[in-house]
Amino acid sequence: DILAAFRVSPQPGVPPEEAGAAVAAESSTGTWTTVWTDGLTSLDRYKGRCYQIEPVPGEPDQYICYVAYPLDLFEEGSVTNMFTSIVGNVFGFKALRALRLEDLRIPVAYVKTFQGPPHGIQVERDKLNKYGRPLLGCTIKPKLGLSAKNYGRACYECLRGGLDFTKDDENVNSQPFMRWRDRFLFCAEAIYKSQAETGEIKGHYLNATAGTCEEMMKRAIFARELGVPIIMHDYLTGGFTANTSLAHYCRDNGLLLHIHRAMHAVIDRQKNHGIHFRVLAKALRMSGGDHIHSGTVVGKLEGERDITLGFVDLLRDDYIEKDRSRGIYFTQDWVSLPGVIPVASGGIHVWHMPALTEIFGDDSVLQFGGGTLGHPWGNAPGAVANRVALEACVQARNEGRDLAVEGNTIIREACKWSPELAAACEVWKEIKFEFAAMDTLDK
């Protein structure tokens, strides 16, 4: 069975048992009345069952309801069908004030019907020939308004300075100021020029997201013809069907696939209603993607540390034990489905490097947009500053130093021999994003 954990907030006067049963019925075989065609099938075989209810500590009138769905209710290899069944209709139920899908347990038999990420973590490292450290990226800013040539120039400067990747922002598709084909050509030129100068393999996340699946595939094919290593997709706005099709194409044609989670906070930010990002992350691993944005813990976007590390493990590891202290409701066995690299992006700069290296480890991408392009000396020095900071943190960690305790000292020591890093540290020494997280663990 597929197991689901729902956070249920019943209307006043509705007992939790009735609410849990209603969720199970509405998201499987139930309807609002008895129908004569019920007698033509075995409802006991196909109906969802609410098998456990527990109150949420500190939250009156909120309950975690566990529902089991028989596997025959779902089409093989279809995240679209899985979500249509489990969350398609039930969230508008009048008997509930609010409903949130907290976690899913995907059984091994169902996991094996998915291809998952096009390549996975180890294959990506082998393709890039980069080991033993996090990868570095940069989102090109301003996200909208640059011409294709100026955009490509910014990519080249960042890659030449020491970054591994540059990135299209999620809303860069094919607008009047920069059509997609022009952008692809200038970015490919930036990749090849910077590779020739640095001797390192470089990439730019070319956003193939489009208004139709046919147009999306046309852009992916053009990227492959240019010989670039990686493309990008906005998987929630583009849809799971489009994403799975693109992931299959990338696997067959040797392209890495970077996934942006644009629109996720509409779905996952409210604590009592919606779908938790750990579910969206599991769905992405099944649908297919080699990278996905996962929050930063320390930057400008929502992300509490234990919760973030919980779904980072769900993205990368092969077997994850149940651990309610990190928000993981079920043990998940991925049976060797390739892993996804988490991407930390949003309001981060060189002072965050020790914390990011310590939190995310080597199998991650650390992406500095404003933290590269905002350098007072220009884009290439901004990239140099980030690369120096990363190398200093990795070396210190490998020497046994504690990044959580000595992080600022390590960065200051590196500033003595890197004027680019010293200038970056001076610019961003006062910038902090200190707000309470909306989504927190139940105590």
From Swiss-Prot:
Cofactor(s) for this UniProt protein: Mg(2+)
This protein's record includes keyword Chloroplast: yes
Reactions catalysed: 2 (2R)-3-phosphoglycerate + 2 H(+) = D-ribulose 1,5-bisphosphate + CO2 + H2O; D-ribulose 1,5-bisphosphate + O2 = 2-phosphoglycolate + (2R)-3-phosphoglycerate + 2 H(+)
This protein's encoding gene: rbcL
Keyword rRNA-binding on entry: no
Annotated residues for binding of substrate: 89, 139, 143, 261, 293, 345
Family to which this protein belongs: Belongs to the RuBisCO large chain family. Type I subfamily.
Record's signal peptide: none
Swiss-Prot/TrEMBL site (Transition state stabilizer) positions: 300
The protein's name in its UniProt record: Ribulose bisphosphate carboxylase large chain
EC number: 4.1.1.39
A GO term from the CC aspect: chloroplast
Cited function: RuBisCO catalyzes two reactions: the carboxylation of D-ribulose 1,5-bisphosphate, the primary event in carbon dioxide fixation, as well as the oxidative fragmentation of the pentose substrate in the photorespiration process. Both reactions occur simultaneously and in competition at the same active site.
Residues binding Mg(2+), per UniProt: 167, 169-170
Chain segments annotated as coiled-coil in the UniProt record: none
InterPro entries, per the entry: RuBisCO, RuBisCo_large_chain_AS, RuBisCO_lsu_C, RuBisCO_lsu_C_sf, RuBisCO_lsu_fd_N, RuBisCO_lsu_N_sf, RuBisCO_lsuI
Record note on cofactor: Binds 1 Mg(2+) ion per subunit.
Subunit structure: Heterohexadecamer of 8 large chains and 8 small chains; disulfide-linked. The disulfide link is formed within the large subunit homodimers.
Pfam families listed in its UniProt record: RuBisCO_large, RuBisCO_large_N
Post-translational modification: The disulfide bond which can form in the large chain dimeric partners within the hexadecamer appears to be associated with oxidative stress and protein turnover.
